Amino acid sequence: MEHISGNSPEQVRERSAAVTGAVEESELKLSAVTMVPVESLLPSDSPRSAGEDVEHIRTLAASGAELPAIVVMPTTKRVIDGMHRLRATKMRGATEIAVRYFEGGEEEAFIFAVKSNVTHGLPLSLDDRKAAATRVLETHPSWSDRAIGLATGLSAKTVGTLRSCSTAGVPQSNVRIGRDGRARPLDPTEGRKLASRLLQENPSASLRQIAAQAGVSPSTASDVRKRLSRGESPLPERDRQQEVPAVARTPARVSRADGSWAPHTVALRHLSRDPSVRLTEDGRALLRWLNVVAVRNQDWDRLLGNVPPHCVKVIAELARGCADIWHRVAEELDQAGIDEAAGRSLSDVG
């Protein structure tokens, strides 16, 4: 997977300074209205896969109403927003049309066109909006799912699905730019590590400077500084646990390949046949839970090999939580067995 070079928050902000996620700012890039000959204008780079809607053009032409100014790229004279209005104006026989020029780049112009067709005029189809979002993902991979969703009329969840399905062709960035224009690291541990290095290299730097360079909030930079002053790791305990390398966990999976799970399988089979367990509601519930976790080693290898990369940390955390619960169950049962044995010993003495 190809990564973008120069992905520091500062560089990302420079690359997308004009489109920092607050898509509404693009509207400020429009010139005053001017009249332009209709024959001087070229068709748009339209997000509509089906092209123009002839019936909609006829409706606009027949309405007789004054149509809003269209938006045009000044350098190429291509229409960014308003092809239906341009066709309707020609159908009316007019030779000039009201135009506002867009002062921005080609990528910004496409995003403006998509957003314009989402918020007014003839709506884009769902397929067109998805195609537009995929294109924005390619040109602005550092934008957050919410920011792209705002521009294309899709939910953040849908954009996230498109991102995960198109990662092979989409350059990857280690930050996301939100709707507020702020760059945030995808992995907060990296931001904390960078803040730690910057603080050690330049102890006199202000927290705002450190936060801006590391792509973290000032409060996070402050927390890192406090941790360093106490001689602690810049990472909270929960993040340090997630950092355990996968290779360190591999032997635990491999060790089951020698059939060490077999005795547990036999024990579970005998337990399932025990009437005192299987003939009670609580016993059957316990058997269901035990059967869920009694997965063979080869099944684990298959399941773990198909976990989506973006779900690894979440599933690992859930697995640790389940392991903690079962560990506590085992300890309580062990203690119950000890207490019962002690009770029998006392009764024997008595």
Swiss-Prot record:
Region Disordered: start-end pairs: 1-20, 168-189, 211-258
Start-end of Polar residues biased regions: 1-10
Highest taxon listed in the record's lineage: Bacteria
Pfam families assigned: ParBc
Keyword Isomerase: no
SUPFAM superfamilies reported in the protein's UniProt record: ParB/Sulfiredoxin
InterPro entries reported in the protein's UniProt record: ParB/Sulfiredoxin_dom, ParB/Sulfiredoxin_sf, WH-like_DNA-bd_sf
GO biological process, one term: streptomycin biosynthetic process
Alphabetized UniProt keyword annotations: Antibiotic biosynthesis, Streptomycin biosynthesis, Transcription, Transcription regulation
Basic and acidic residues composition-biased segments: 177-189, 223-242
Protein name: Streptomycin biosynthesis operon possible regulatory protein
